[in-house]
Amino acid sequence: VTVSKDAAGRWFVSLLVEEEISPLPPVAENVGIDAGITALATLSTGEKIVNPGHERRDRRKLAKAQRALARKAKGSANRAKARARVAKVYARIADRRRDHLHKVTTRLVR
């Protein structure tokens, strides 16, 4: 058992278990993936996977939290709270990005 806490103040517990993993049945068709800038990816079938819309809103929220942090006096309690707020926004961005990529890759595999 491993217990850890991240910068955003969230606690995580990790357990090690043994489990048999059944492989997925093979998919008949192959698909090429081209990572892009305007679209997250373009498949060889012509399908485009769009970037998540929440990314821009989250970046604005992060910029606002960072500006608030920059105005705080070093060593103050308010600065510590502002740092925690920035860490929380970063964690939310990372979580949402990871969730989106997991959903996209799962859809491609199945």
Task: Give residue ranges: language-model regions.
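Substrate-contacting helices/loops that form the catalytic groove of nucleic-acid
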Residues: 3-110
